[in-house]
Curated annotation (Swiss-Prot):
Lineage: Eukaryota, Metazoa, Spiralia, Lophotrochozoa, Mollusca
Residues with D-tryptophan modification: 64
Protein keywords: Cleavage on pair of basic residues, D-amino acid, Hydroxylation, Ion channel impairing toxin, Ionotropic glutamate receptor inhibitor, Neurotoxin, Postsynaptic neurotoxin, Secreted, Signal, Toxin
Recorded GO MF terms: ion channel regulator activity; toxin activity
Propeptide: 18-51
Name of protein: Conopeptide-Ac1
Role noted for this protein: Ac1 weakly inhibits N-methyl-D-aspartate receptor subunit 2B (NR2B) (IC(50)=8.22 uM). In vivo, shortens sleep latency and extends sleep time after lateral brain administration. Is more potent than Ac1-O6P for these effects. Also has an analgesic activity similar to that of Ac1-O6P. Ac1-O6P has no or very weak activity on voltage-gated channels and receptors tested. In vivo, shortens sleep latency and extends sleep time after lateral brain administration. Is less potent than Ac1 for these effects. Also has an analgesic activity similar to that of Ac1.
Tissues of expression: Expressed by the venom duct.
Source organism: Conus achatinus (Little frog cone)
Length: 66
């Protein structure tokens, strides 16, 4: 009986119901009306920002922990 309750109360809703936030992430860029050039620019911007963060992390010169 506990197995059936677990299946119907936990596993069944997790498998069938989809959250609203997950729906747009599953679509391709073309379906979101984003052309490949715009997608490439966004990706390039994020990669550049990430690289700069690791090369030059934010460390103020006059902070109390340095």
């Amino acid at each position: 009986l506990g197995v059936l309750v677990t299946i119907f109360l936990v596993l069944f809703p997790m498998a069938t119901l989809q959250l609203d936030g997950d729906q747009t992430a599953d679509r391709h860029a073309g379906e979101r009306d984003q052309d490949p050039l715009e997608q490439y620019r966004n990706l390039k911007h994020v990669l550049r920002r990430t690289r700069n963060y690791y090369l030059y992390p934010a460390r103020p010169e006059n902070s109390w922990w340095t």
